[in-house]
Amino acid sequence: DEVDPEQVYYDDPHGLGGLKYPFYFGLDPYRPDKTDYWPEYLFRTIDLVRGEAEDLSVHGEIFSPWTQLLELFGYENALVYLLDEPQKCRAILAAYTEGAADLGIRQARRGVDAVLISSAFAGGGFISPRQYEQFVLPYETEVVRRIRQEGVPVYTHTCGDIGDRLERMAASGIDGIDTLDPPPLGSVDLENAKRRVGDRLFFKGNIDAVNTLLHKTPAEVRQDALWRLKVGSPKSGYILSSACSVSPRVPPENLSILVETSEEFGAPAM
Protein backbone atom coordinates (compact mmCIF):
# COMPACT_ATOMS: atom_id res chain seq x y z
CA ASP A 1 0.00 0.00 0.00
CA GLU A 2 2.94 2.32 0.51
CA VAL A 3 3.97 2.19 -3.15
CA ASP A 4 2.27 4.82 -5.29
CA PRO A 5 2.46 3.88 -8.99
CA GLU A 6 2.60 7.60 -9.79
CA GLN A 7 5.92 7.82 -7.94
CA VAL A 8 7.79 5.03 -9.73
CA TYR A 9 9.43 5.27 -13.13
CA TYR A 10 12.58 3.16 -13.34
CA ASP A 11 14.69 1.38 -10.70
CA ASP A 12 18.08 -0.12 -11.49
CA PRO A 13 18.38 -3.29 -9.37
CA HIS A 14 22.17 -3.00 -9.43
CA GLY A 15 22.43 0.60 -8.30
CA LEU A 16 25.51 1.32 -6.18
CA GLY A 17 24.83 0.42 -2.56
CA GLY A 18 21.16 -0.13 -3.26
CA LEU A 19 20.61 3.57 -3.97
CA LYS A 20 18.29 4.44 -6.80
CA TYR A 21 18.58 7.21 -9.33
CA PRO A 22 17.50 9.93 -8.85
CA PHE A 23 18.64 9.96 -5.23
CA TYR A 24 16.01 11.09 -2.75
CA PHE A 25 16.50 11.79 0.95
CA GLY A 26 12.96 12.66 2.00
CA LEU A 27 13.43 16.42 2.35
CA ASP A 28 10.55 17.27 0.04
CA PRO A 29 7.59 15.37 -1.41
CA TYR A 30 9.05 13.19 -4.15
CA ARG A 31 7.88 13.73 -7.70
CA PRO A 32 10.01 12.08 -10.39
CA ASP A 33 10.84 14.46 -13.24
CA LYS A 34 10.16 12.13 -16.14
CA THR A 35 11.36 14.70 -18.69
CA ASP A 36 14.85 14.88 -17.14
CA TYR A 37 15.27 11.60 -15.27
CA TRP A 38 18.52 10.17 -16.62
CA PRO A 39 22.07 11.24 -15.71
CA GLU A 40 24.22 12.10 -18.71
CA TYR A 41 26.94 9.66 -17.65
CA LEU A 42 24.68 6.75 -18.59
CA PHE A 43 24.94 7.78 -22.21
CA ARG A 44 28.55 9.00 -22.20
CA THR A 45 29.49 5.38 -21.57
CA ILE A 46 28.10 4.52 -25.00
CA ASP A 47 30.18 7.31 -26.54
CA LEU A 48 33.35 6.11 -24.80
CA VAL A 49 32.94 2.52 -25.97
CA ARG A 50 32.19 3.67 -29.50
CA GLY A 51 35.30 5.83 -29.51
CA GLU A 52 37.61 3.06 -28.33
CA ALA A 53 36.18 0.08 -30.21
CA GLU A 54 34.52 1.11 -33.44
CA ASP A 55 34.51 -2.47 -34.72
CA LEU A 56 32.48 -3.85 -31.80
CA SER A 57 28.73 -4.26 -31.67
CA VAL A 58 27.56 -2.06 -28.78
CA HIS A 59 24.34 -3.03 -27.02
CA GLY A 60 22.30 -1.13 -24.47
CA GLU A 61 20.55 -2.82 -21.57
CA ILE A 62 17.36 -2.04 -19.69
CA PHE A 63 15.56 -3.90 -16.94
CA SER A 64 12.09 -5.14 -17.75
CA PRO A 65 9.07 -3.87 -15.82
CA TRP A 66 8.74 -7.36 -14.36
CA THR A 67 12.32 -7.41 -13.07
CA GLN A 68 11.85 -4.02 -11.46
CA LEU A 69 8.65 -5.15 -9.73
CA LEU A 70 10.47 -8.14 -8.22
CA GLU A 71 13.33 -5.97 -7.03
CA LEU A 72 10.96 -3.37 -5.60
CA PHE A 73 9.23 -5.78 -3.22
CA GLY A 74 11.71 -8.64 -3.00
CA TYR A 75 11.16 -11.88 -4.89
CA GLU A 76 8.95 -13.74 -2.43
CA ASN A 77 6.85 -10.73 -1.51
CA ALA A 78 6.36 -9.77 -5.15
CA LEU A 79 5.02 -13.21 -6.02
CA VAL A 80 2.59 -13.01 -3.11
CA TYR A 81 1.46 -9.54 -4.21
CA LEU A 82 0.63 -10.91 -7.66
CA LEU A 83 -2.04 -13.00 -5.97
CA ASP A 84 -3.16 -10.52 -3.31
CA GLU A 85 -2.94 -7.23 -5.24
CA PRO A 86 -2.95 -8.01 -8.97
CA GLN A 87 -4.41 -4.65 -10.02
CA LYS A 88 -1.87 -2.71 -7.96
CA CYS A 89 0.90 -4.79 -9.51
CA ARG A 90 -0.40 -4.02 -12.99
CA ALA A 91 -0.40 -0.30 -12.24
CA ILE A 92 3.20 -0.47 -11.05
CA LEU A 93 4.22 -2.53 -14.09
CA ALA A 94 2.61 0.06 -16.36
CA ALA A 95 4.60 2.82 -14.65
CA TYR A 96 7.85 0.89 -15.04
CA THR A 97 6.98 0.32 -18.69
CA GLU A 98 7.20 4.06 -19.29
CA GLY A 99 10.64 4.33 -17.73
CA ALA A 100 12.05 1.22 -19.40
CA ALA A 101 10.86 2.33 -22.83
CA ASP A 102 12.23 5.83 -22.26
CA LEU A 103 15.69 4.54 -21.35
CA GLY A 104 15.77 2.11 -24.27
CA ILE A 105 14.77 4.84 -26.72
CA ARG A 106 17.48 7.15 -25.40
CA GLN A 107 20.08 4.40 -25.75
CA ALA A 108 18.92 3.77 -29.31
CA ARG A 109 19.19 7.44 -30.18
CA ARG A 110 22.68 7.55 -28.68
CA GLY A 111 23.80 4.95 -31.19
CA VAL A 112 23.65 1.44 -29.72
CA ASP A 113 23.31 -1.39 -32.23
CA ALA A 114 20.68 -3.24 -30.19
CA VAL A 115 18.89 -3.08 -26.85
CA LEU A 116 18.73 -6.01 -24.44
CA ILE A 117 15.76 -6.30 -22.10
CA SER A 118 16.96 -8.02 -18.94
CA SER A 119 14.00 -10.07 -17.71
CA ALA A 120 15.91 -12.78 -15.91
CA PHE A 121 13.16 -14.03 -13.62
CA ALA A 122 10.34 -14.44 -16.13
CA GLY A 123 10.93 -18.17 -16.56
CA GLY A 124 9.18 -21.23 -15.23
CA GLY A 125 11.12 -21.24 -11.98
CA PHE A 126 9.20 -18.13 -10.92
CA ILE A 127 5.91 -17.83 -12.78
CA SER A 128 3.56 -19.99 -14.83
CA PRO A 129 2.88 -19.41 -18.54
CA ARG A 130 -0.49 -17.90 -17.61
CA GLN A 131 1.14 -15.46 -15.20
CA TYR A 132 3.68 -14.65 -17.89
CA GLU A 133 0.83 -13.66 -20.20
CA GLN A 134 -0.71 -11.47 -17.49
CA PHE A 135 2.26 -9.78 -15.85
CA VAL A 136 5.14 -9.89 -18.34
CA LEU A 137 3.97 -10.07 -21.93
CA PRO A 138 1.77 -6.93 -22.16
CA TYR A 139 4.42 -4.67 -20.65
CA GLU A 140 7.43 -6.05 -22.51
CA THR A 141 5.42 -5.88 -25.74
CA GLU A 142 4.93 -2.16 -25.26
CA VAL A 143 8.58 -1.58 -24.38
CA VAL A 144 9.67 -3.51 -27.48
CA ARG A 145 7.23 -1.66 -29.73
CA ARG A 146 8.50 1.75 -28.72
CA ILE A 147 12.20 0.94 -28.97
CA ARG A 148 11.87 -0.81 -32.33
CA GLN A 149 10.28 2.35 -33.71
CA GLU A 150 13.79 3.82 -33.43
CA GLY A 151 15.05 1.24 -35.93
CA VAL A 152 17.04 -0.76 -33.37
CA PRO A 153 16.67 -4.52 -32.74
CA VAL A 154 15.48 -5.61 -29.31
CA TYR A 155 16.08 -8.97 -27.65
CA THR A 156 15.24 -10.47 -24.27
CA HIS A 157 17.39 -12.16 -21.63
CA THR A 158 15.48 -14.69 -19.52
CA CYS A 159 17.25 -17.39 -17.53
CA GLY A 160 16.40 -20.98 -16.79
CA ASP A 161 13.18 -22.76 -17.67
CA ILE A 162 11.68 -21.03 -20.75
CA GLY A 163 10.98 -24.02 -22.98
CA ASP A 164 7.26 -23.74 -22.25
CA ARG A 165 6.98 -20.06 -23.26
CA LEU A 166 9.08 -19.49 -26.36
CA GLU A 167 6.04 -18.64 -28.47
CA ARG A 168 4.83 -16.23 -25.81
CA MET A 169 8.19 -14.52 -25.76
CA ALA A 170 8.14 -14.23 -29.53
CA ALA A 171 4.68 -12.66 -29.34
CA SER A 172 6.21 -9.60 -27.63
CA GLY A 173 7.71 -8.56 -30.96
CA ILE A 174 11.35 -9.09 -29.97
CA ASP A 175 14.03 -9.88 -32.53
CA GLY A 176 15.85 -12.49 -30.46
CA ILE A 177 16.22 -14.44 -27.21
CA ASP A 178 19.32 -14.58 -25.03
CA THR A 179 20.52 -17.46 -22.79
CA LEU A 180 18.28 -20.39 -23.84
CA ASP A 181 19.63 -22.50 -20.98
CA PRO A 182 19.81 -26.17 -22.02
CA PRO A 183 19.00 -29.07 -19.69
CA PRO A 184 19.82 -29.54 -16.86
CA LEU A 185 20.25 -25.80 -16.22
CA GLY A 186 17.11 -24.94 -18.16
CA SER A 187 14.69 -26.55 -20.59
CA VAL A 188 15.59 -25.38 -24.11
CA ASP A 189 16.54 -27.96 -26.70
CA LEU A 190 18.07 -25.95 -29.55
CA GLU A 191 16.69 -28.06 -32.38
CA ASN A 192 13.20 -27.94 -30.89
CA ALA A 193 13.42 -24.18 -30.35
CA LYS A 194 14.53 -23.61 -33.95
CA ARG A 195 11.53 -25.55 -35.24
CA ARG A 196 9.13 -23.56 -33.09
CA VAL A 197 10.32 -19.94 -33.36
CA GLY A 198 13.58 -20.03 -35.30
CA ASP A 199 12.00 -18.46 -38.37
CA ARG A 200 11.15 -15.34 -36.35
CA LEU A 201 13.91 -14.89 -33.77
CA PHE A 202 17.68 -15.01 -33.62
CA PHE A 203 19.10 -17.06 -30.77
CA LYS A 204 22.03 -16.24 -28.49
CA GLY A 205 23.49 -18.72 -26.03
CA ASN A 206 22.49 -22.32 -25.25
CA ILE A 207 26.01 -23.48 -24.34
CA ASP A 208 25.95 -25.01 -20.87
CA ALA A 209 28.13 -22.68 -18.79
CA VAL A 210 28.78 -25.34 -16.14
CA ASN A 211 28.81 -28.82 -17.64
CA THR A 212 30.45 -27.71 -20.89
CA LEU A 213 32.52 -24.55 -20.36
CA LEU A 214 33.64 -25.37 -16.83
CA HIS A 215 34.23 -29.11 -17.02
CA LYS A 216 35.02 -30.03 -20.64
CA THR A 217 38.25 -29.84 -22.62
CA PRO A 218 38.82 -27.22 -25.33
CA ALA A 219 38.34 -29.91 -27.98
CA GLU A 220 35.00 -30.91 -26.48
CA VAL A 221 33.93 -27.27 -26.18
CA ARG A 222 34.78 -26.75 -29.85
CA GLN A 223 32.73 -29.78 -30.88
CA ASP A 224 29.77 -28.53 -28.83
CA ALA A 225 30.07 -25.03 -30.28
CA LEU A 226 30.22 -26.28 -33.87
CA TRP A 227 27.06 -28.32 -33.38
CA ARG A 228 25.17 -25.31 -32.02
CA LEU A 229 26.39 -23.08 -34.82
CA LYS A 230 25.17 -25.57 -37.42
CA VAL A 231 21.79 -26.01 -35.74
CA GLY A 232 21.24 -22.42 -34.69
CA SER A 233 22.45 -20.41 -37.67
CA PRO A 234 19.84 -21.20 -40.38
CA LYS A 235 16.86 -18.88 -40.81
CA SER A 236 17.07 -15.99 -38.34
CA GLY A 237 20.64 -16.58 -37.16
CA TYR A 238 22.55 -17.52 -34.04
CA ILE A 239 25.11 -15.79 -31.80
CA LEU A 240 27.49 -18.25 -30.16
CA SER A 241 27.79 -17.66 -26.42
CA SER A 242 27.34 -19.25 -23.04
CA ALA A 243 23.75 -19.72 -21.95
CA CYS A 244 24.08 -17.52 -18.88
CA SER A 245 26.77 -16.38 -16.45
CA VAL A 246 30.28 -17.75 -16.85
CA SER A 247 31.90 -19.12 -13.72
CA PRO A 248 35.15 -17.41 -12.64
CA ARG A 249 36.74 -20.86 -12.71
CA VAL A 250 36.05 -21.48 -16.40
CA PRO A 251 39.44 -21.98 -18.13
CA PRO A 252 40.20 -18.97 -20.37
CA GLU A 253 41.07 -21.29 -23.25
CA ASN A 254 37.50 -22.62 -23.22
CA LEU A 255 36.25 -19.08 -23.85
CA SER A 256 38.88 -18.37 -26.48
CA ILE A 257 37.87 -21.48 -28.40
CA LEU A 258 34.35 -20.08 -28.74
CA VAL A 259 35.69 -17.01 -30.53
CA GLU A 260 37.96 -19.09 -32.76
CA THR A 261 35.21 -21.56 -33.63
CA SER A 262 32.70 -18.83 -34.41
CA GLU A 263 35.14 -16.99 -36.68
CA GLU A 264 36.07 -20.23 -38.41
CA PHE A 265 32.43 -21.18 -38.94
CA GLY A 266 31.50 -17.75 -40.27
CA ALA A 267 34.53 -17.26 -42.52
CA PRO A 268 33.66 -16.88 -46.22
CA ALA A 269 34.57 -19.79 -48.47
CA MET A 270 37.79 -19.26 -50.44
Describe the residue ranges of each PLM region.
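Active-site loop segments of alpha/beta catalytic cores
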Residues: 2-270
